[in-house]
UniProtKB/Swiss-Prot annotation:
More about this protein: There are two types of cytoskeletal and microfibrillar keratin: I (acidic; 40-55 kDa) and II (neutral to basic; 56-70 kDa).
Organism listed in the record: Mus musculus (Mouse)
Spans annotated as Linker 1: 108-125
Ranges for region Coil 1B: 126-217
Protein name as catalogued: Keratin, type I cytoskeletal 23
Region (Rod-like helical tail): 379-422
Single GO MF descriptor: structural molecule activity
Ranges of biased composition (kind: Polar residues): 1-24
One Pfam family named in its UniProt record: Filament
Amino acid sequence: MNSSHSFNQTYSASVHSLGSTRGRQGSCHRAPSVHGGAGGVRISLSFTTPGCLPPGGSWGSGRSSPLLGGNGKATMQNLNDRLATYLEKVRALEEANSKLETRILRWHQEREPSHRKDYSQYEENISRLQEQIVDGKMANAHIVVLIDNARMAVDDFNLKFENEHSLKKDLEIEVEGLRKTLDDLTIVTTDLEQEVEGMRKELILMKKRHEQEMEENHLPSDFKVSVKVDTTPGEDLIKVLEDMRQEYELIIKKKHQELDTWFREQSAAMAQEVASPAPVQGNQSDIHELRRTFQALEIDLQAQHSRKTALENMLTETRARYSCRLQDMQQIISHYEEELIQLRQDLERQNNEHKVLLGIKTHLEKEIATYRRLLEGDTEGTMDGSESRLKGSEASTIKAITQESVNGRIVLSQVNEIQKHI
């Protein structure tokens, strides 16, 4: 059908152009137009009658015609016959085409059901179910997001709890260290107090002994040695450290209780939210509240850190102050020890000199008595006695040994020999 259709179009166009060319040569009679062909294609055919021929009876007079050649009538007759045959074929094809279309239409009518089912209700149900599925997916995705947020919040709370727990352990360790330091300082303070008390007792005993020796040696009553220790009462370090320890314990206990209560409340709230998801606004308000709580806890933690730092600085200053005081006391004690050693050496030297002087005094008194007896006239007995005494005195000498000792060691030793005539 398509091939015949294209052929008809081509042939009609060529014949039409031929007729139009001839029409320009002169006036002629045209046959009526013939319409036909498959698909309603118009075919126009124009041909000339013998009256339209030029003078001479043929197209070939005067010039040659490339289409008609010699006999134009026979050629036109041949063309008309061929056209008639072609038109008959076209009509036959049109009839066959119409029959085929009728058969196709009948076949379609036979195959089509008499009653079509109405699927509009099902389509509405399907669209509604699809919308419900989409809504369910959105709600499920929202719930998944809420669950993820809740898990992240729980992880954050667990991390914060672990951090607070580790901080608590660190504070406990520091408090334990401060307690040990306090105990050590208490022991050191007690030892120092005992040493100072012992040295005071020793100083009192030395004063008494010195007074006794001075009384024995007939020293003037106004010769006295007074040693005074000026100690300013300082702060009670044990009480300060005990107050600090109690304050730290109260802070740690309070923070532990607050964190435990807060964690339980948040865990219960998160469990309820996971079991039955609350609205988004409620979750947002809870998140804001938790953030505010977290910020408040951070501020409180920073305050506690600063307070701890201040207490540590105070403890360091207290240690430094008391160490300076202890050094001063040790220097004072060392100075008094040196003075006591010097005083002992002076007393021993004076005692030795006193003994030497007493011996000299005794010998002089004896010599004076002898001279008196000689002057009184007892010449014989006394001269013999005096000569014997003078002979004995020539060989008698008195040695005075003076020693200076520091911390039990002899530093300087002097020997003084005094000859006495008895």
